[in-house]
Amino acid sequence: MSAKWERDSDASKGTLTFEIDVDTINKGIDEAFVETRKKITVPGFRKGRVPRQIFNQMYGEESLYQDALNKVLPDAYNEAVKETNIQPVDQPKIDIKSMEKGQPWVLTAEVDVMPEVKLGEYKGMEVPAQDTTVTDADVDDALETKRQQQAELVLKEDKPAEKGDTVVIDYKGSVDGEEFDGGSAENYSLELGSGSFIPGFEDQLIGHNADEDVDVNVTFPEDYHAKNLAGKDALFKVKIHEIKEKQLPELDDDFAKDVDEDVDTLAELKEKTKKQLQEEKDNQAKAAIEDAAINKAVANAEIQDIPQAMLDDDTNRQMQQYLAGMQQQGISPQMYFQITGTKEEDLKKQFANDAAQRVKTNLVLEAIVDDANLDATDEEIAKEISDLAKQYGMEEDAVKKALSKDMLMHDIKIRKAVDLVADSAKQVKDDEKSDK
């Protein structure tokens, strides 16, 4: 086969010209004839039994060309792609240039291909320094959060509601005198100051007592998920049934044992909490360094225009992964769109906004894998399978069936590229930054 690839100037697309040899064409025509004659009736012959010569006299061999092409084109195109070593990212647009009897057929394919990446600096780059210090105040705040979680709610009598109290209410909302879906409830428990209701709603209940009726006037935010309510003024008729206040436990050894069965004293709980906070800060710092360093590596690289097909694929993949995550939490796509007051197109636009950056990042990381000759060993692949099996509670054989060796190798190599970029980065404070 003869194939030629011509890339458009500074673009991730071009024209692939290729031929289909006569032997391959004839085999395709033979197969097309066998299938076609089953469908036609010629006087003097049983259906499906017309001889080839008679068929050619009546219909012409050229009538089989399109069916023959459909049979031989996929393999011919794939061979041309392999011969020219290009990486298509979408279905090609095929054009027939020559289809003559007894001659190779000549075709062209307009193809979007993987963009070329010219790496810039990606090692030893400066990134903002990360503070991983865990202070006593951090530990105190964490313990206070645990206290709040262990608090008991006790009935508050003859005292008005304050921030932090929980009120049990009935409410009914209306806009322009008309009630709306989801705007009413009975015996609803609401913590004042939690920010779980529309801005201003909770504040207007502070200072009121049990058994009071309160008119609450609010304005829905402009970006409110229910588009029919966004930016509109609303009136809520509220009945306060009960007011409850938090009763916090003492910060002592008994409290420590209640929140963590593995400790016996408050001192042990503080030490364990500090270690947990340190691990969290270290992980956050690592992620921040990775993001900053990789973003710089992407900015330093020269990347050709990204084909729309790659952006669309990324957007659809991200959206499906997100909806699958919702499904695991018991929220179907239909339920999600109903709850959020959005449509599938809205979610797609949300993920499309960052598609270009995600695709560029993947392209640069793959280029770094090649540039640094990164690879995945059999031992690393085996460990990856073992780790995934433990993470998802699966048998290792099930992981092997779900994920191909190539997929596992790709993930390992990409992680190595991330580590290479991040581990070589230099943390600098604002007053120490250079031009790097």
Curated annotation (Swiss-Prot):
The gene is tig. NCBIfam families: tig (TIGR00115). It is an enzyme of class 5 (isomerase). Its EC number is 5.2.1.8. GO terms for cellular component: cytoplasm. One of its GO terms (biological process) is cell division. GO terms for molecular function: peptidyl-prolyl cis-trans isomerase activity; protein folding chaperone; ribosome binding. Consists of 3 domains; the N-terminus binds the ribosome, the middle domain has PPIase activity, while the C-terminus has intrinsic chaperone activity on its own. HAMAP family: Trigger_factor_Tig. Involved in protein export. Acts as a chaperone by maintaining the newly synthesized protein in an open conformation. Functions as a peptidyl-prolyl cis-trans isomerase. The lineage of its organism: Bacteria, Bacillati, Bacillota, Bacilli, Lactobacillales. It is found in: Cytoplasm. Keywords: Cell cycle, Cell division, Chaperone, Cytoplasm, Isomerase, Rotamase. This is Trigger factor.
